């Protein structure tokens, strides 16, 4: 089954929550609770100590930076971005940034067998990859 994600933009959903992305939800909470802690990473779930605990404002800023960088690279709405990363705070924020940019995240576990990784990359057809 093919799904044209570009045609979903501006499409009206029946319920208000169906029209929101994760990025939209984080922005809304950021407006009302900017300094509340949003994300806490367990030891080993973040590469940079500054990512250990983030407020909604900080998480939204990082996700926006990712979104702007991806769009500045020439990607367009609906393009696939491969995430070849371990589970981490940074990878989670990258997924949110990808969604905010109107792109499609294709997460791929780096612990998978190389032949399966190659097959999944071929299937996803990413325009760009984020690798940790």
Locations of the language-model features?
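Short, flexible loop segments at the rims of nucleotide/cofactor-binding pockets, characterized by
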Residues: 14-18, 58, 106-108
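Structured binding elements
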Residues: 102
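Anion (oxyanion) recognition and catalysis
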Residues: 99
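Flexible acidic/glycine-rich loop/turn elements at helix↔coil and beta-strand↔loop transitions
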Residues: 28-35
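Flexible, non-catalytic linker and terminal segments flanking ANL/adenylate-forming cores
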Residues: 1-23, 42
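Active-site phosphate/pyrophosphate- and oxyanion-stabilizing loops and adjacent acidic/basic residues
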Residues: 27-28, 118
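Conserved AMP-binding/adenylate-forming core of the ANL superfamily
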Residues: 18, 35-96, 113-118, 122
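Conserved ATP-dependent adenylate/AMP-binding module captured primarily in the ANL superfamily
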Residues: 106, 110-132
């Amino acid at each position: 089954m093919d799904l044209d994600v570009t045609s979903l933009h501006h499409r009206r959903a029946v319920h208000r929550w169906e029209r929101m992305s994760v990025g939209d939800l984080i922005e809304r909470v950021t407006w009302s609770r900017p300094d509340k802690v949003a994300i806490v990473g367990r030891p080993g779930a973040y590469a940079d100590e500054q990512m250990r605990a983030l407020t909604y404002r900080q998480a939204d800023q990082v996700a926006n930076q990712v979104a702007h960088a991806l769009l500045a690279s020439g990607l367009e709405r609906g393009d696939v971005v491969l995430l070849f990363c371990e589970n981490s705070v940074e990878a989670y924020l990258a997924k949110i940034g990808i969604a905010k940019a109107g792109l499609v995240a294709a997460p791929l576990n780096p612990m998978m067998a190389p032949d399966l990784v190659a097959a999944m990359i071929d299937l996803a057809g990413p325009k760009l990859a984020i690798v940790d």
